[in-house]
Amino acid sequence: MKTCAIIPVKQFSKAKTRLDLSIEDTRVLCKLLLEEVLGTISKSSLIEKIILVSKEDEVFQIGKKFDCIEIFDETESGVNNAISLADSWISNSNFTHSVIFPQDIPFMTTQDIDMLFNFCIFKNSVILVPSRHFDGTNALIRTPSDIMETRYDEGSYKFQFESAMLKTSHYSLALIHRIMLDIDSRDDVNFVLQKNIKPTICQKLEEIFQLS
C-alpha cells in the first residue's frame, strides 16, 4: 500500500467567513489549523506524501516544513476542482491510495489515521468520515484515487456515497470522533474547547477568539 494525503486549502483571506474574524485573526487561525494537521499527518507511518493544493503562497511556505508536494490552484473554483488537480498528479505516480483531509481538523491524531486505514481492506473501495454535524466530509479514502469523482460543497457526505456507489460496492462510513471535529462555526469552537482534547491547540483557539 502506497498512500498520499491531499489537502485542498483556500486562500486564507477568503476562508472561514462564518467565524466572523478579522482578516489577520483568520490568517492566524488558518495557519494554526494547517500546521497542526500537517504535523499529525507527517507523523503517520501510513502516509508517504502530502499534496497541498492552493493558491496561497503562505500555505506552500508552511508545507515546505513537511516536504509537501505543491500544486497551484490558479482558479480556486472549489474543492472538487482542487482534488482533480491532485488526481492528475497522482495518475502519473505509483500511489495506490489517497486520503483527502480538510485543513480544519486539528484534533485528529496519528492513532485516528491508523484506525481509519484499518477499514481499508478492499482494492476498490471508498471510506468516508463525516463531520460532527453529518453535513460534510472530514476524511475520504479512495482506492484507487481515480475510483470516483468527489462531490464536496453539496451539503452532505451522502453525495460522496452516491458517486462511490456508481463505481464500487465497497464503501463504508467510519465514525472516528476526533476526525469528525472541525472548525467551521463559533458553535464548533465552543464544542471543541469543552472537550479540551489538545490543550495547547485549545489555548491558542481561546486566544484567537478572545475567550480566555
Provide a role label for each language-model segment.
Residues 1-19:
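N-terminal nucleotide-binding beta1-loop-alpha1 segment
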Residues 31-47:
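A short, N-terminal amphipathic alpha-helix
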Residues 45-70:
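Acidic donor-binding segment of Leloir-type glycosyltransferases
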Residues 64-97, 156-157:
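Short phosphate-binding loop-to-helix
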Residues 99-101:
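Short aromatic-hydrophobic micro-motifs that form the base-stacking/packing surface
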Residues 108-134:
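Conserved donor-nucleotide/metal-binding helix-loop-beta segment in metal-dependent transferases, i.e.
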Residues 142-164:
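Short, glycine-/small-residue-rich phosphate/pyrophosphate-handling segment
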Residues 162-212:
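Conserved alpha/beta core of the MobA/IspD/sugar-nucleotide pyrophosphorylase nucleotidyltransferase superfamily
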